[in-house]
């Protein structure tokens, strides 16, 4: 009998700094099923990298506040890497995407080989 796949998806996201005009890069995984917990968990791994020059995609709204202010999602290239104006920030985003790729491969392999180890 076939087991349903978990389909854990790993993505790179931004979090606004509270005190400065910069954004923290982090890798988010969802859904992650952990032992002892009934509901799927959202796992965040912060990369200790910040960027200050993301390019915002004005055609993709993230949310609109009660006072009418709209925030936007970052612009991404064809590979899903966040676009930045400065070269240093762009390298940080490429690094974050490499980490995302590694984590995605780990979750995919864990899902594939979980059945073979149990037998």
Model-derived features with residue positions:
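Basic/aromatic DNA-contact patch characteristic of tyrosine site-specific recombinases
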Residues: 1-119
């Amino acid at each position: 009998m076939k087991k349903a796949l978990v389909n854990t998806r790993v993505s790179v996201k931004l979090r606004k700094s509270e005190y400065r005009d910069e954004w923290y890069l982090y890798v988010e995984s969802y859904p992650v099923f952990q032992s002892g917990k009934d509901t799927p968990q959202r796992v965040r791994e912060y990369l200790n990298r910040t960027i200050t020059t993301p390019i915002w995609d004005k055609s993709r709204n993230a949310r609109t506040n009660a006072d009418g202010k709209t925030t936007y999602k970052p612009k991404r290239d064809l590979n899903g890497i966040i676009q930045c104006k400065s070269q240093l920030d762009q390298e940080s985003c490429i690094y974050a995407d490499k980490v995302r790729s590694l984590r995605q491969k780990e979750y995919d392999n864990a899902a594939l080989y979980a059945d073979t180890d149990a037998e």
